[in-house]
Amino acid sequence: MLERYANEEMKALWNEQTKFETYLEVEKAVVRAWNKLGQIQDSDCEKICSKAAFNLECIKEIEKTTKHDLIAFTTCVAESLGEESRFFHYGITSSDCIDTAMALLMTKSLKLIQKGVKNLYETLKNRALEHKETLMVGRSHGVFGEPITFGLVLALFADEIKRHLKALDLTMEFISVGAISGAMGNFAHAPLELEELACEFLGLKTANINNQVIQRDRYARLACDLALLASSCEKIAVNIRHLQRSEVYEVEEAFSTGQKGSSAMPHKRNPILSENITGLCRVIRSFTTPMLENVALWHERDMSHSSVERFALPDLFITSDFMLSRLNSVIENLVVYPKNMLKNLALSGGLVFSQRVLLELPKKGLSREESYSIVQENAMKIWEVLQQGAFKNADENLFLNALLNDERLKKYLSEDEIKACFDYSYYTKNVGAIFKRVFE
């Protein structure tokens, strides 16, 4: 975890102090459960729950000998107690405490992620509504296609982010489970009721069955969902970067007073935040392979997953949280240039209307093949003109002029019918209906 890419609230969940505090919370829940089952006296339960304490230096010192951080933890806590310490960590195994504590930490962390996703969705929605009718050129393969609106671009992003909210709700169900089932998961030394009570105290569900650990397909699902979320965020960031290129310049990240873009070139205004998000997404996705490989543990459990999770889980949550907040800020403060969008539309010389013309000709009795041939032939002529450099008059509709002078077209379409094909409103007539689908 790098301080540079961490928000305080999420970072506070992933440190040694919080980890052991959560261990203690789990151990106290187990003590309370034993007490409710009549196996620990009220006085011992009260002493443990009120007096049990630890300090990190003590744990570190003990771990030098034990080479086992959970045993170092329980030993340290026992030193803060009296005879009642015999009931601390009673009847359970290390993974019962560690995995159940991890469930608590992941649940809290995922709630922060869900909050970040909701914020991003709302920001995308608001900006989409703001630019619902803002005309721009749609691009496929990076090449001009047909007129669309910037609002549609943002609405598409919003709808994708909304799908992640649904996926994360399901993932929350998978990860918010505890396990107090003993060394082999067969409840040999503690009844099922102990697990049920302890998890109830902690606000967790119980798994139907465990071995020594909570099964790692649950963790892998989380990692994959965060990787998918990152890919969607990268998709948004990459498109912003493309639209901010100098020759496009339809949107721009906010550039603050005093900000610098280059140590060598004073004129530079770069999409550095979107570039940063792109890089963070690569980091997030990089954890999916080791987390998937953690699923296949030996028999009832081995330790190969532990080192992976010590890296992966904190970094997955902290980086995802930061990525979401940064992207939300980029979208919220994004500067949009509608005039440049219209200018770029005009740069096609009218070619963006080719399909509209193509679809009118078959209505007049011409075959699709003949229609396509005529329209494409005229379009290719315009490409040749555009290849020679920018035309003198940006408002000049080269494609329209070519069509109006084509004798073959005149047999099927009048001048007014041809001109009617060059109408931007034709391409925006369904925007309202699309928005209704997305946002209502």
Regions found by a protein language model. Give the residues of each.
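A helix-coil-helix interface module used to build multimeric assemblies
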Residues: 1-187, 192-197, 206, 259-262, ...
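Short beta-alpha connecting loops at secondary-structure transitions
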Residues: 11-15, 58-60, 259-279, 301-315, ...
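Amphipathic alpha-helices that form helix-helix packing interfaces
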Residues: 30-33, 113, 117-120, 124-127, ...
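Alpha-helical support elements that line or immediately flank enzyme active sites
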Residues: 32, 105-117, 226-235, 240, ...
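Glycine-rich cofactor-pocket loops
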Residues: 129-151, 250-261, 267-268, 299-308, ...
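Glycine-rich anion/phosphate-binding loop at the beta-strand->alpha-helix junction
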Residues: 164, 212-305
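Active-site-adjacent "gating/activation" loops or surface patches in catalytic cores
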Residues: 195-212, 216
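Long, amphipathic alpha-helical stalk/connector segments used for oligomerization, subunit docking
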Residues: 283-366, 374
